Amino acid sequence: MEEKMLPVPNEGHRRRRFHWGSIATVILVVAVCVYAFTLFGDKESPENTQTANDDTDWNLVLVNYENAIPENYESKLVEVPGGEKVDERIYDPLMEMLEAAKEGNWDQLPMVVSGYRTQKKQQQLYDDKVAGYRKEGNSQSEAEELAKQWVSVPGYGEHQIGLAVDINGATYDLYFWLQENSYKYGFIFRYPGDKTDITGVAEEVWHYRYVGVEAATEMYEKGLCLEEYLAERQAVRH
């Protein structure tokens, strides 16, 4: 299928923490496969381990290149339009957000092009990405490091807990709308370009994570990523 690019936004559309120059060539209308290759991880065992019984709100569990999915973590899944699945606890706010987002998407319902992923699926995506970089002439270690910028190592990705979605639309305006309104529904723009040194992930304007309205609102108002929010929250508790 021929790939079709979305229209490039003009300067008047720019928003804070939004760096379109670096991603204008990556956001595709129908290239679902690109959006599948979206998370960053680390193959090495993390220093901080979690279990499903830790005193952490389910919606604020941290999964990234340093923090593996909690042991015995389980998600009850439900299907969304398009066939992808998410944790049933985020279904209602997700659908409310997508319905409202039609105003920024030419009155079309945005699509979830990647939701929950199994361990097998995540492994396949990671291996395929590594293989792609190997074909470009990179060594195995180089290919793995490059792959981690876009695909999380199995066991270290938010898609495997069912709380993250990759959203595709008909226009770039959708992503502007999501950045400015997703918090109202409990979702956060998970990987902004100016937080890469903290999240370890390149800017992904399509990737949204559910954290709850209260947390999402505070993160939006303070300009925090999830790692910063949780660190601040922990400091207050102590």
Regions found by a protein language model. Give the residues of each.
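Extracytoplasmic cell-surface/polysaccharide-interacting catalytic and binding patches
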Residues: E2-H238
